[in-house]
């Protein structure tokens, strides 16, 4: 059984035992300047409203509805193929410790699967996606490569001990993905929470990466700390990879005894964190 987790920063999950990843991304509107109202007879045209200073992270307005995209691809963040809606077991958004709000209306649109999110409340929203477990057979060479790249040393050693390195592997994968958005107050409404002050919380996914500190305010030059949880408990000795658009190679870090990994952020923009846990089951 292979459990996958992904965490998207700047809005972003993983497949595995292959060269593809699955990620989730909230599509949020950009700030625009409203047109000036028409001039009254004999009067001067009103000055256009000054554009609101855009937040340095994805934001949605409380009460609005927007799209959330799910896709898979071999070259993040370029989409390759949609995730069939019937393969989505759970999809939701949660603010703080509030009740998860389901993402609805899943439909395929070319290489993307689009869902709708209605943003309620204010603060840091965490998007969660869990796919239906999937069984398949992976050729020996591809599976050995996957185990090496994911840092599954114990699984590699056990296959070698059992002389299985040239045998195909029958696997069951469980995939999940997470991403963030800031939910802000509507115009002229009272602000009750600051998304930038929000802290990431575990969603209860089988395997998940939980960001340390405020995930929305990270910048190039910062060091991102993230804790990998397997069934809610810290997982030590696991490899965490970070993919950035345009980067030649993924950054890698190993979780310590507390399940925490530290990754230096070298550039601005989106980032996809990936991790996997491999567990052998008896027939």
Model-derived segments and spans:
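Short amphipathic, basic-aromatic surface patches that mediate peripheral association
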Residues: 72-81
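Short acidic/polar inter-strand loop motif in beta-rich domains
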Residues: 132-140, 279-283
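Glycine-centered loop-to-beta-strand initiation motif
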Residues: 111-113, 121, 255-269
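Short amphipathic beta-strand segments in non-cytosolic proteins
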Residues: 89-99, 239-253
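Short, ordered, surface-exposed loop/turn motifs in non-cytosolic proteins
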Residues: 84-86, 232-243
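Bacterial N-terminal signal peptides
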Residues: 1-10
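Beta-strand-rich domain onsets/edges
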Residues: 16-47, 52-67, 154-224, 229-236, ...
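Short beta-strand segments within Ig-like beta-sandwich modules, predominantly Fibronectin type-III
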Residues: 103-108, 252-256
């Amino acid at each position: 059984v292979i459990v996958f987790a992904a965490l998207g920063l700047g809005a972003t999950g993983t497949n595995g035992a292959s060269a593809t990843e699955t990620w989730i991304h909230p599509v949020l509107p950009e700030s625009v300047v409203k047109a000036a109202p028409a001039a009254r007879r004999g009067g001067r045209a009103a000055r256009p409203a000054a554009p609101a200073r855009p937040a340095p992270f994805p934001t949605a307005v409380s009460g609005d509805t927007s799209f959330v995209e799910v896709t898979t691809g071999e070259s993040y963040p370029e989409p390759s193929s949609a995730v069939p809606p019937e393969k989505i077991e759970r999809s939701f958004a949660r603010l703080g410790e509030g009740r998860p709000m389901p993402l609805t209306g899943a439909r395929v649109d070319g290489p993307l699967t689009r869902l709708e999110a209605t943003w309620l409340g204010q603060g840091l929203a965490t998007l969660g996606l869990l796919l239906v477990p999937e069984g398949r057979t992976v050729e020996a060479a591809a599976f050995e490569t996957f185990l090496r790249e994911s840092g599954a040393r114990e699984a590699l050693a056990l296959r070698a001990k059992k002389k299985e390195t040239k045998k195909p592997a029958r696997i069951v994968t469980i995939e999940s993905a997470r991403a963030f958005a800031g939910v802000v107050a509507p115009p002229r409404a009272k602000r009750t929470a600051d998304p930038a002050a929000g802290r990431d919380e575990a969603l209860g996914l089988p395997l998940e990466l939980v960001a340390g500190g405020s995930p929305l305010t990270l910048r190039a030059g910062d060091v991102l700390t993230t804790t990998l949880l397997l069934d809610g408990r810290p997982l030590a000795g696991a490899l965490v990879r970070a993919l950035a658009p345009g980067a030649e190679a993924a950054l890698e870090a190993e979780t310590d005894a507390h399940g925490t990994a530290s990754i230096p952020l070298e550039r601005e923009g989106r980032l996809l964190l990936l991790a996997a846990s491999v567990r052998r089951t008896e027939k």
